[in-house]
Structure formats: C-alpha cells, structure tokens
Amino acid sequence: MTDRILIARIGAPHGVKGEVRLFAFGEDPLALKRYPLTDESGARRFKVQSLRAAKDHFVARLEGIADRNAAEALTNTDLFVPRDALPAAEDEDTFYHADLMGLRVEDQSGALLGTVLAMHDFGAGDVLEYTPEGGGRTLLLPFTKAAVPVVDVPGGRIVVVPDTNPDETPPEDADQA
C-alpha cells in the first residue's frame, strides 16, 4: 500500500488573483483545508486557505499563490495527503482507490483475469479498469457489489463477475439483426 493518497488535482486558474479550480477525489472535499497536502514528489507543500463549490469543481485559494501566473504554473498538479492523516475506512465496503491499484482480478472460480489498473468516476458511479492477463485492451466494469462481489485488499485480489462488463454484453437488439 502507498503511504500517500491522491486526494485532489489542481485545474486551471480561476480569475486573476491566484485562485485555482480544484477537483477533489474524496467524500469530504472541505476536509482539504485540514490536510497537509503535497505534490507527487512530496517536495512542495500546499495549504488551502479557502474553498468554495462551483459547478463541477471547487475554487480554492492556496497559501502563497497570489496571481494568475502562479496559479497557472500549478495546472494539473496532483495533490497528495499522507495515509495516516486520513480517517480509517468505516466498514469493509469502503476503500481508498489507491489500495485497489495492482490487485489481481479473478473470476468467481479463482481464475486470474488481470490486474486493476485504475478507478474512474465519469459521473454515474465508480468504474474499475483492469488490464487483461493475456494482454489486449483494458476492460471496464462498474464498481458495484453485483459486478465486484469481493474486494480482498489484504489478500491482494478482487473477484469480478465478467458478464457485467458493458464491453462484453451484446446490445439488446443484437439477435434481431
């Protein structure tokens, strides 16, 4: 497991006074004001001075960022927080996405299907992306209890029901062609 968790990404500047668009990845975006944030290398530290909601993101003022040029230089900077600064998972069905990366993907019989590559949220719920064991293009599954009935982080695996994969499900009218 990683000792730092990706918690937000800085977007483009907002206005001319150094504010930035901020895309938060946690359940409580306002908690970003409490966390010790760093860039990916851990060398640069950030403190959120103010945070307000916008359409599909937040607008943040970061300590030491006073103008648009300074804000622009931070565009696409990922913000990380130390794992020990985050709350523990509340139940067995709560995970940090970082803990799922690299887990073995198995079917219900235990056959290896691939490896977890990424988690995505396109607006309709989390989607799991995995690399197939035999190579080829990555596959996507909805990250639901029906499609992913077992998540065993300590055991290094997840169990999936492959026929819930939209990429492998034929269209409803496929047999009418």
From Swiss-Prot:
- Where is the protein situated, by its record's location annotation? Cytoplasm
What is a biological process (GO) this protein takes part in? rRNA processing
Gene3D superfamilies according to UniProt: PRC-barrel domain, RimM
Kindly indicate whether the keyword rRNA processing belongs to this entry. Answer: yes
The task this protein performs is described as: An accessory protein needed during the final step in the assembly of 30S ribosomal subunit, possibly for assembly of the head region. Essential for efficient processing of 16S rRNA. May be needed both before and after RbfA during the maturation of 16S rRNA. It has affinity for free ribosomal 30S subunits but not for 70S ribosomes.
Main localization is cytoplasm
The Swiss-Prot or TrEMBL record annotates one GO molecular function as: ribosome binding
Which NCBIfam families has this protein been placed in? 16S_RimM
| Keywords from the named record | Chaperone, Cytoplasm, Ribosome biogenesis, rRNA processing
- What does the record say about domains? The PRC barrel domain binds ribosomal protein uS19.
Q: Which domain of life is it from?
A: Bacteria
All copies of the PRC barrel domain together span: 92-166
Similarity remark: Belongs to the RimM family.
What is this protein's name?
A: Ribosome maturation factor RimM
